[in-house]
């Protein structure tokens, strides 16, 4: 059994082959291929693509499944593809991001329980300690609302900024910064672009998966690492709401929460750059 990886860049024209059958009945999702049911899952390449590949190569066949992975490097695409029926499920996002997508786009998408967490980190080519960030420094930050709030919370915990009283960190944006003692200048960019802009800024807050794809290790290379305890940003399997009770989808989610997957995550990312959430 082989996982098929279909890389899709943000600027590419999407020609997604839809193999998911929209419908709410049991076993309605996926494409039957002999004794196996093929599920097409959209995911970011690292670590979700790696985790799905492990499941496909080691666990899926015994559960009657064949997993085909469609890789995305643009966060705006997997939920649209799922909503449009081009894929059967996706695995790339956290709950605050899904909530913002549902509210903004009207998607009817349901999340399962978190599988893994990729801590955010602050990276710099020149600065070795967060305390050494100079006045008027330029710091790269996500431009999507849910991840921007996450980055601001991490910077607040490091006492680089202070958010206004009563602001929920999940919803925080740059205009919610009340105190900025070093007069840090924020440079907004798409999550996938932040690692590429490190030469142009003093430091940058980068998503764990994007950092790994760029050859950066959050736990080892970051000058500031997000706290993992009570973190609401775990990534999960998501499906169209009408398919949340589908038996094949539930089988896949069970595999993703299996002891084998937990051990795989702990062994492959023993440095803590990716953590199991179960």
Q: Across the structure, where does each feature detected by a protein language model lie?
A:
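A conserved helix-loop-strand patch within extracytoplasmic ligand-binding domains
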Residues: 112-161, 262
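Short helix-initiation/N-cap motifs at beta->coil->alpha
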Residues: 69-80, 168-196
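Periplasmic-binding protein-like
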Residues: 147-156, 256-276
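Short, polar/charged alpha-helical segment
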Residues: 38, 45-68
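A bilobed periplasmic-binding-protein/Venus flytrap-type ligand-binding module shared by bacterial periplasmic
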Residues: 119-130, 233-246
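Secretory targeting and sorting signals
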Residues: 1-22
């Amino acid at each position: 059994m082989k996982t098929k990886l279909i890389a899709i860049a943000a600027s590419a024209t999407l020609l997604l082959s839809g193999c998911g059958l929209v419908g709410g009945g049991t076993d309605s999702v996926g494409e039957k291929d002999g004794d196996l049911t093929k599920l097409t899952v959209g995911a970011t390449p690292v670590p979700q693509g790696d985790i799905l590949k492990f499941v496909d190569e080691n666990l899926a066949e015994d559960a009657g499944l064949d997993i085909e992975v469609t890789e995305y490097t643009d966060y705006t695409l997997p939920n649209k593809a799922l909503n449009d029926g081009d894929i059967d499920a996706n695995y790339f996002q956290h709950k605050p991001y899904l909530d913002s997508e549902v509210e903004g786009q009207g998607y009817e998408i349901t999340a399962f329980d978190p599988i893994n967490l990729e801590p955010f980190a602050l990276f710099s080519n020149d600065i070795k300690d967060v305390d050494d960030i100079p006045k008027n420094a330029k710091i790269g930050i996500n431009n999507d609302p849910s991840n921007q709030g996450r980055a601001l919370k991490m910077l607040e915990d490091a006492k680089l900024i202070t958010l206004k009283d009563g602001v929920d960190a999940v919803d925080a944006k740059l205009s919610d910064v009340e105190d900025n003692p070093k007069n840090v200048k924020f440079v907004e960019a798409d999550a996938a672009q932040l690692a590429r802009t490190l030469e142009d800024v003093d430091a940058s807050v980068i998503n764990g998966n994007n950092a790994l794809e760029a050859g950066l290790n959050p736990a080892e290379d970051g000058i500031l690492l997000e706290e993992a305890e009570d973190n609401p940003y775990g990534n999960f399997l998501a499906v169209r709401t009408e398919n949340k009770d589908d038996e094949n989808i539930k089988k896949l989610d069970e595999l993703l929460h299996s002891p084998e997957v937990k051990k795989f995550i702990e062994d492959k990312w023993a440095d803590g750059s990716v953590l199991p959430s179960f």
